[in-house]
Amino acid sequence: MNSGDIMKLNIKKILTIGKREVLSNIKRKQFLIATIIGPLIIIALAIIGSFMMFDIKEIKVGYVDEFGLGIPNKVVENNFGKNTTIYFIKYENIEKGKEDVLNKSIDALIVIPKDYLDSGKIILYSTTKSPNPIITDTLNKFLLKKLLKGKVDNKTYNRVINPMNLEIYSVSKKGFEKETFLSQLLPIGFVFLLYMAISSLSGIIVSSIIEEKQNRIMELLLCYSSAENLMFGKILGISAVGLLQIGIWVLFALPIIITYAVKVSLYLAIFALIYFVLGYLFYSSLLCGLSSLFSHPKDASQLISPIIIIQIIPIMFMNTIMVNPNHYMAKILSYVPFTAPYAVVLRASVTQLPLIEIVLSTAIMIVSIVISFILSIKLFKIGVLLYEENLTLKRVIKIIFKK
């Protein structure tokens, strides 16, 4: 962007275009579905699934005890606050037990072989590939109790069942901070939130720009303002829509954070906010420029989809990054603008990053955003009035380097 381009920027017009973009996009059905209805459906399905999983009043389990453990007639298990009764039905014949599993007379059949003590082998027959965990957990506890009976006291038995109550503390120059399971999930949540936000952003940008090109609204807007003002206004408006969408998603998650008193590190929160904004600006400017070249969503998806797919790379290496934040792959991803917003936040969630790495990564992101804006303005000025069919990557590259 040269000084001439900067002089063409009109804040009032940018804000007017941005406002129009916000109002037109929040009225779209896609926005309502993706922002409110989608999360509500996911939450509803999760609640229904949990209710169905944990609201099991009784389970019938057949067994053939060749070893002679002496299995009780029934066991009552506390299943997330609700009691589930497991009835054990003795079988003398394995084939009869299998038959009853098939006709759903019993939920599962357990066979304890004669050589159980030597092999530790237990055979379970079920109509499902993944048997109910209540059955396997109950059986595991029962076997431990039988094997340890008369050999250890109750205190030792309870410790064998639950060998440790692990507390994790992160160590830094500021001192010690206790970590919880949910606080460890927050950076993972951030990664998926950013991925969803940028994926949603691409859909909003593509549909908005292409729709305006098809309806020739873009030409009317260019009569009102320059291409630079129009692009900045669109980025501002679409970014505002995206942030509104994220704000609504965060509101859905807020009850969980408050209920479980999840501690959010200020250090991590600042990192997440900075890199979220940097990532959002980088992708929004790039997508805006590229989308303007196309007249049909199908054509646009061929070029834009690979850019969105690149984001999956840090998700693929998420475990490596969090287990070993100083791994060379984690560092490389921290310096690539497409992946840095993900990699840096994941690394910062498990370790204190050196200042030089933070400065270098942030500088690369800022420079990349500036380059992205310069490139996108060039594409936008040409693309908004371009109505070519089946635009190829080769043609796009020619447009980029055309003087």
Curated annotation (Swiss-Prot):
- Decide whether keyword Hydrolase is in the record: no
Listed A to Z, the keywords are: Cell membrane, Membrane, Transmembrane, Transmembrane helix
What top-level branch of life does the organism fall under? Archaea
Molecular function via GO: ABC-type transporter activity
| Pfam families, per the entry | ABC2_membrane_3
Q: Where in the cell is it found?
A: Cell membrane
The cross-references to InterPro entries, in alphabetical order and at most eight, read: ABC-2_transporter_component, ABC2_TM
Q: Which residues cross the membrane?
A: 31-51, 186-206, 238-258, 268-288, 303-323, 355-375
Ligase listed as a keyword: no
Please provide, in alphabetical order, the Gene Ontology terms of the cellular component aspect for this entry.
Answer: plasma membrane
Q: How does it sit in the membrane?
A: Multi-pass membrane protein
The family note in this entry says: To B.subtilis YhaP.
UniProt-recorded name of the protein: Uncharacterized protein MJ1024
- Name the species this protein comes from: Methanocaldococcus jannaschii (strain ATCC 43067 / DSM 2661 / JAL-1 / JCM 10045 / NBRC 100440) (Methanococcus jannaschii)
